[in-house]
Amino acid sequence: MNEIREAVVQTPEQATAVIRAEALAKTYAEGKMRTPVFDGLDLSVATGETVAIVGASGAGKSTLLHLLGGLDIPTAGEVYVAGERMSALSDAQRGKLRNQSLGFVYQFHHLLPEFTALENVMMPVLLSGKNVAVAKGQALQLLESVGLGHRIDHKPSELSGGERQRCAVARALVNKPGCVLGDEPTGNLDDKTAGTVFELMLELNRAQRTSLVLVTHDRGLARRLDRVLELHQGKLRELAPSAV
């Protein structure tokens, strides 16, 4: 049996896609030089689904994640988030859609150093137009759920690496997004702490039915997600469990 199959990468029938990419292409240009990253990628992520994206360094995994999140513009093709075609939106509209429908967790936490853990997690709620009381309530609930209820008044410099990343996870989930995009979210942590943060993300995925799309080099973590997709030579292919 062929362990690797070229991915049209469809979701289960009748599932609602929180993110969909159609014929996605990205080429970088510098002067007369053209460097194609990938061409004609199709991807659909269902509500509550967890997807790992693996591949060699430089394969374009982070580029793909940025395109899915509307942080970069594809050379060709379309990305749909919560049913909205990203290319049809203005910069302001894309920003609003990202804040409402997507969460982001990176290898480095990107917490604002001058703000406390509570204030950092409140930020996306405030940006969505809700008042301070609502933002504080939602942020406190998430910080409690990630085990940081006793650290809400601490700034990032006063938190451990694992605590900072848990705070970043809380920030990503505070608006109850349809999908969280993670770029090596545990890559900067020791194995034990990485496992704790990963378990936390899976627990919140189950509790909130938030989809996860995680770029990772850790095949062990990848195997625990619903699907594993490998980006190889500009193509996405789905790996059978025994091939991961």
Swiss-Prot record:
A GO term from the CC aspect: plasma membrane
Gene: lolD
Domain ABC transporter, first and last residues per copy: 19-244
Subunit note: The complex is composed of two ATP-binding proteins (LolD) and two transmembrane proteins (LolC and LolE).
Domain of life, per lineage: Bacteria
The family this protein is said to belong to: Belongs to the ABC transporter superfamily. Lipoprotein translocase (TC 3.A.1.125) family.
GO BP field: lipoprotein localization to outer membrane; protein localization to outer membrane
Keyword terms of this UniProt record: ATP-binding, Cell inner membrane, Cell membrane, Membrane, Nucleotide-binding, Translocase, Transport
Taxonomic source organism: Xanthomonas oryzae pv. oryzae (strain KACC10331 / KXO85)
Topological relation to the membrane, as annotated: Peripheral membrane protein
Annotated PANTHER family: IMPORT ATP-BINDING PROTEIN, LIPOPROTEIN-RELEASING SYSTEM ATP-BINDING PROTEIN LOLD
Record function comment: Part of the ABC transporter complex LolCDE involved in the translocation of mature outer membrane-directed lipoproteins, from the inner membrane to the periplasmic chaperone, LolA. Responsible for the formation of the LolA-lipoprotein complex in an ATP-dependent manner.
Cell compartments where the protein resides: Cell inner membrane
Annotated EC: 7.6.2.-
Lineage: Bacteria, Pseudomonadati, Pseudomonadota, Gammaproteobacteria, Lysobacterales
Name used for this protein in its record: Lipoprotein-releasing system ATP-binding protein LolD
Residues reported to bind ATP: 55-62
MF annotations from Gene Ontology: ATP binding; ATP hydrolysis activity; transmembrane transporter activity
Cross-referenced Pfam families: ABC_tran
